[in-house]
Amino acid sequence: MFEMYIESGMNKLRCGYTTGSCATGAAKAATMLLFDLINSEEELNEIEIDTPKGIKVEMPIDHVVVGKNFVQCTILKFSGDDKDITMGLEIQATVEKISKEEAEELSKKLISNESKIIVLDGGIGVGRVTKDGLFVAKGEPAINPVPRQMIIKEIESILPKDKYVKVIISVPQGTEIGKKTFNPRLGIEGGISILGTSGIVYPMSEDALKASIKLEIKQKSLKNKNLILTFGNLGENYCKSLGYIEEEIIICSNFIGFALECCVSCKVKSILIVGHIGKMSKIAYGCFNTHSRVCGVRLEVLALELTLLGYDVSLVNKVLNEKTCEGAVKLLGSGYENLYKNIGKKILNSMKTYVYDELKIDAVMYYGASNPILLWSSCLE
């Protein structure tokens, strides 16, 4: 069993392996069994693969199905201490013997290696790409370039001479799980993606989230140079209630600065940021990672702006004693339009400074979770 750890502060966190590694291991194991490259099925309890990181990964084989001309192996996705949505998913590879003629014909429409002895496709639960701008061409299975290379390389290393195989990667629960990932937003339908650039899942996968944000901006900016940035599902729903459509909305989580940088690099012309005052107030004073562990100022922004407007210190203290911005807004009640306007203008100035005025920027700020209520919008100025 694969055991690798990284240090995170005072904690020791266990790494896992990607869906790409699972697919590779399952495909290699199935090929070995199909061509009797081991003594018996019982002997193959684990499979070892090389990863692009140069780290060897051993994975247990969950179960095997042997047919007349095919073998199917299943490996369970293991995410280590990064408990993502794919943890425990069955990743299956079915490897089938085919003729040279079949391989040549299939290679015209499926993924294949240079010598056309291996053809590769996605089965049930592996998404299909329906839009341009991704790492995989429109119409192809969502098996990313590195996992493709890994699968082909491992099979090439063991496939007997003058033998040809068709490899199908499937994820039985992938159709449902795929709906809960970024895939529908990216135009990947019908399942999950087979991913991984290193073969290893590292806990605290901030990089993976950023990569998804970058990819979504790249893909959506191909057809739309005016995008909407928001922080999460609540913001997305509010955007839709305002009439915006999914094709122009980007969920950037806490990484607003990173998302702005991606918009600039993708030649986006304008962005509208839509967010709850709790997140937006942080941007007003230059915080472009809005996670509470990175920046906790929210009530302090409201308190400072109230002070600058000349409000009594007793009111300022009441705001500071609230637990959330939501509570502070409700405490204040109506009649504080200038407060939200001043914060809003500072949000715009802060963002424009961040991108060196390379983007036209507007902002919408609201409060309320179940029923968002507009506090300020530069679009109405």
Curated annotation (Swiss-Prot):
Domain of life: Bacteria
Catalytic activity: Co-precorrin-5B + S-adenosyl-L-methionine = Co-precorrin-6A + S-adenosyl-L-homocysteine
Enzyme Commission identifier(s): 2.1.1.195
Keywords, sorted A to Z: Cobalamin biosynthesis, Methyltransferase, S-adenosyl-L-methionine, Transferase
Pathway where this protein functions: Cofactor biosynthesis; adenosylcobalamin biosynthesis; cob(II)yrinate a,c-diamide from sirohydrochlorin (anaerobic route): step 6/10
UniProt KW Protein biosynthesis keyword: no
A Gene Ontology molecular function term of the record: cobalt-precorrin-5B C1-methyltransferase activity
Gene3D superfamilies: CbiD-like
Any GO BP: methylation
Top-level class of the enzyme under EC nomenclature: transferase
Keyword S-adenosyl-L-methionine: yes
NCBIfam families with a match to the protein in the record: cbiD
Protein family: Belongs to the CbiD family.
UniProt name for this protein: Cobalt-precorrin-5B C(1)-methyltransferase
